[in-house]
Amino acid sequence: MSLIECKNINRCFGSGENRVHILKDISLSIEKGDFVAIIGQSGSGKSTLMNILGCLDTAGSGSYRIDGIETAKMQPDELAALRRERFGFIFQRYNLLSSLTARDNVALPAVYMGMGGKERSARADKLLQDLGLASKEGNKPGELSGGQQQRVSIARALMNGGEIIFADEPTGALDTASGKNVMEIIRRLHEAGHTVIMVTHDPGIAANANRVIEIRDGEIISDTSKNPEIPASNVGRIREKASWSFYYDQFVEAFRMSVQAVLAHKMRSLLTMLGIIIGIASVVSVVALGNGSQKKILEDISSMGTNTISIFPGRGFGDRRSGKIKTLTIDDAKIIAKQSYVASATPMTSSGGTLTYRNTDLTASLYGVGEQYFDVRGLKLETGRLFDENDVKEDAQVVVIDQNVKDKLFADSDPLGKTILFRKRPLTVIGVMKKDENAFGNSDVLMLWSPYTTVMHQITGESHTNSITVKIKDNANTRVAEKGLAELLKARHGTEDFFMNNSDSIRQMVESTTGTMKLLISSIALISLVVGGIGVMNIMLVSVTERTKEIGIRMAIGARRGNILQQFLIEAVLICIIGGLVGVGLSAAVSLVFNHFVTDFPMDISAASVIGAVACSTGIGIAFGFMPANKAAKLNPIDALAQD
């Protein structure tokens, strides 16, 4: 069985009136270890035939078999495997990647074979040394002469074994001396057992082969052999290694090429990233503002008491009849405090009036509360003490004042132990509260706190309370507790003449509202991300067009479609991730400036928003980079190689 066997191969280009029949019923067979020269003038079809034999192109009709296997039935990746494992190409124009060194160009086919990095470099250096380029491993193609570049191309063809060498006009771009040197190398390869198929228009070059096939106008007109003896082929084939390093090395290579592509066009890459940068910075900043404002509001709510339920007379805030309802009593508070899910219950009554100290009269509000009130409301003592259970039982004439009262009446003295008059009733100051920075409402109001028994019995003379503040135990559900309290009070009062304000409900409402606002504004900011993604897609399409030749070279040496897809997809994702990280950094800088000048609430950048931003930019890279990458992966190798 012949190594290569073609029967009735036809290839046409164009369609309709422009249809050109390049190859016409070509039939031939090539044995293992043969040295065949295909000769003909320009346009004769010799290069087209070699491209079909090298699986860079496909025949329009006919049969082409390698070791008896029909190539027409092979998938693109199966054809890539043939090029990778059995073929080696020597091109007239060398087709080296200008961004890689001689060593890296030679080693590139082995990347797609899964060969380890050290083994790959050692083999590449050995091949370069054998071809007289031992001192040129680190040189890039632009630093080498034409003859040296062609020898690098030959070394690359041998990297994976090169059982079958395809040489397309190997001396066409070389001077006479370099051409002779290259032909001597090719003859030695044949003598070593490689099957060599060479295309040339020069009869003198063709004379080096054992067999010469002449083509004219797409047809074989002669097939002569001058030496029927074919040396035994002992060329070892390097097998693909499917290990973790196989995938790792291919990813590293794709990543390295992506970085080089990004750095090669710095300004273009920066402008491409700009949409991503603005979009990510906008989203992260909006979320940070939302987090900061939500945190501030929730802190304010917490200052009013956590896990608390406040009970008021009436049907709701603004109920005009609430002042006439006097059914909320101290006994209600005592019964509520005994419930299993209640930590404490403190009644509250209030009174407005004139506060007098020496010759100063001020308008203030006095609140009658229980000893637990301050803990429930999260109020902190600055100096002195709070009243206790005994003070409540004994109707003690003591009072705790806020910072506003202290500043107005005791700016230059210690208020503790001083007696003040409220509605002409003497009260002894026993404590001063810290200023409540998180409190709602007017911060200039003068506030006093005394035992509710003192206020009710000695000042207002009323037996009912304005409200009851209930602290729910940490392990209890506030909604269930609210329902239980409602049933308890309805049973006591015989009607629902009260309403409740659950701090947990307020918290949930704030979280829901701020979450909705963040989502709304983030959705607007996401538009710039979509615009940025379109920019990435556009620039990647340009990149594919610019690097079509590179894609063709990689396919010729055995890259799968997946390898090409991976490389360009990584490039798109890399641009987006860098843009995302810069966007996060920009948002962090804005946050620092904002927090320096604005003290009402901070910009709070969370780890979740940063992770989400990077994930979002990665997703955009994948989504908008897939189409250009897929376009690159589906290019026909010979069409890609034909691009300049």
Swiss-Prot record:
Its EC number is 7.6.2.-. PROSITE patterns: ABC_TRANSPORTER_1 (PS00211), ABC_TRANSPORTER_2 (PS50893), MACB (PS51267). The chain crosses the membrane at residues 270-290, 524-544, 574-594, 607-627. It is found in: Cell inner membrane. It is a multi-pass membrane protein. Homodimer. This is Macrolide export ATP-binding/permease protein MacB. It comes from Neisseria gonorrhoeae (strain ATCC 700825 / FA 1090). The gene is macB.
